[in-house]
UniProtKB/Swiss-Prot annotation:
The keyword Transmembrane does not apply. The gene is pomc. InterPro entries: Mcrtin_ACTH_cent (IPR013531), Melanocortin_N (IPR013593), Opioid_neuropept (IPR013532), PMOC (IPR001941), POMC-derived_peptides (IPR050878). Residues 56-98, 148-170 are annotated as: Disordered. Residues 70-93 have a biased composition (Low complexity). GO terms for molecular function: neuropeptide hormone activity. This is Pro-opiomelanocortin. Residues 148-162 have a biased composition (Acidic residues). GO terms for biological process: neuropeptide signaling pathway. It comes from the Eukaryota. Residues 19-90 form a propeptide. Keywords: Cleavage on pair of basic residues, Endorphin, Hormone, Secreted, Signal. Residues 1-18 form the signal peptide.
Length: 222
């Protein structure tokens, strides 16, 4: 009976005295004679009593902590370790890609390529609206510059044609200084009127000149 009493002492140390006394007074445990059967009976009775233990009302910190179950503790420890190992990975993989500031500054986002029906790749304007706007402005400026160049080339071609026509006219006809005022003056005004013919001029000034000379000679002789 010594092992039985040792078992009872261990149970008394591990549990409360009221529960052990209840299990010892239980008729199913009193009818047993072997040590192993009595040990099993006391363990079963103690587990039943602890399962039926009432919850003490009041603050949660004043209630006694629940007894840990070895089978359940291992099952709880494994998920926690797995969750702790998976939590950094999940936090690491999460990134706010739906915001523009979700990515770090040094890392550039790749533009989304849209394949049109013609098979040409076009970048979506939702990813980089500023960049797309700048490209549109650059294309507009290039188109305006090309139009100005075309107009300048047309003007130069017209000027060259006019110069060719002028050269052809000079070769065919006589040279006329149309860009001077005296290019084509009337005959009466050429050289101040000294180049008139004898018929065109009046003979009265010459006659008066002769008369004046004769009169002067007569006066000197007197």
């Amino acid at each position: 009976m010594c092992p039985v009493w040792l078992l009872v002492a261990v149970v008394v140390v591990g549990g409360s005295r009221g529960a052990v006394s209840q299990c010892w007074e239980h008729p199913s445990c009193q009818e047993l004679n072997s040590d192993s059967s009595m040990m099993e009976c006391i363990q079963l009775c103690h587990s039943d009593l602890t399962a039926e233990k009432p919850v003490i009302p009041g603050n949660a910190h004043l209630q006694p902590p629940p007894l840990p179950d070895p089978s359940s503790s291992s099952s709880f420890i494994l998920p926690s370790s797995s969750s702790s190992s998976s939590s950094p990975q999940s936090k690491r993989s999460y990134s706010m890609e739906h915001f523009r500031w979700g990515k770090p500054v040094g890392r550039k986002r790749r533009p989304v390529k849209v394949y049109t029906s013609n098979g040409v790749e076009e970048e979506s304007a939702e990813v980089f609206p500023g960049e797309m706007r700048r490209r549109e402005l650059a294309s507009e400026l290039l188109a305006a510059a090309e139009e100005e160049e075309e107009k300048a080339q047309e003007v130069m071609a017209e000027e060259e044609e006019e110069q060719k026509q002028l050269l052809q006219e000079k070769k065919d006809g006589s040279y006329k200084m149309k860009h001077f005022r005296w290019s084509g003056p009337p005959a009466s005004k050429r050289y101040g009127g000294f180049m008139k013919s004898w018929d065109e001029r009046s003979q009265r000034p010459l006659l008066t000149l002769f008369k004046n000379v004769i009169n002067k000679d007569g006066q000197q002789q007197k």
